[in-house]
Amino acid sequence: MASLRFSVTFPALLSLLLLSLWVVEAYTSRKLISNNEQEGQNISHLFKDGEFEDPTMYMFFKISDLKLGTKLPIYFNKNDLRKVPPLLTRQEADLIPFSESNLDFLLNHFSISKDSPQGKAMKETLKRCDFKAIEGEYKFCGTSLESMLDLAKKTIASNADLKVMTTKVMVPDQNRISYALHNYTFAEVPKELDGIKVLGCHRMPYPYVVYYCHGHKSGTKVFEVNLMSDDGIQLVVGPAVCHMDTSMWNADHVAFKVLKIEPRSAPVCHFFPLDNIVWVSK
């Protein structure tokens, strides 16, 4: 199994994350492909095309899926490099206020209309970053790589080594990467990382790169997974996280709808897009 873990040095971290920002962005999408492909599978939580407009809604799966041989349809959407926002240094980011209370100033600063899609996305990002953590959760928003690294260390690492995991698509020839819908099968038994503290960091819509990072103080399982496409060309190697206790989650959380489970009643698992970052520490 290809290892996803390594000790972080700041120059190496910068190189890794800068690269990740300029590659593809993955969305895991649950769709019905064909009756033949579904034969013998439990597809009760898979959705037909068009049930949700946003493909990022289909990143979730059940913990019972997490085993050798399970087949899941996954859709990888190529990121438009022209739309990747700039990456600021800590010095640059610290000069710009980052709070919903400063929204009017920020919209004017970036010349963005309040009612535009970009303006609404900015508001939602700031609101999410301003929200207080729920009981048993830790969260923060990193507005630069330096601040994200420092906050990750402070939150989960203390004196322990901080490591990073990302999702990667491996192919014999880069020209053979396909972003169409494929069936992927767990090619190896998922490897659970015991005794791990974890922070998942998701890139948010904003005029510059912002990561929303969150994790739970207990009740989270972390796995390394290997997924092979049906054509045997693409190997997806990356982290998967299962939240074992969802009793404190919002009852309207989209994961419950996607998986068709009673709210707060069962574990919820998910993969990570390629531009997400997962911090782990013993």
UniProtKB/Swiss-Prot annotation:
Keyword Ribosomal protein: no
Annotated organism of origin: Brassica napus (Rape)
Known tissue expression: Expressed in the radicle and cotyledon of germinating seeds 2 days post-imbibition (DPI), in stems and roots of 30-DPI young plants and in floral buds, but not in fully open flowers or leaves. Expressed in the embryo and seed coat tissues of developing seeds. The protein accumulates only in seeds and only long after transcript accumulation becomes evident.
Protein's cellular compartments: Protein storage vacuole
UniProt-listed Pfam families: BURP
Lineage: Eukaryota, Viridiplantae, Streptophyta, Embryophyta, Tracheophyta
Transmembrane annotation, as ranges: none
InterPro entries per record: BURP, BURP_dom
Name this protein carries in UniProt: BURP domain-containing protein BNM2A
Source taxon at top rank: Eukaryota
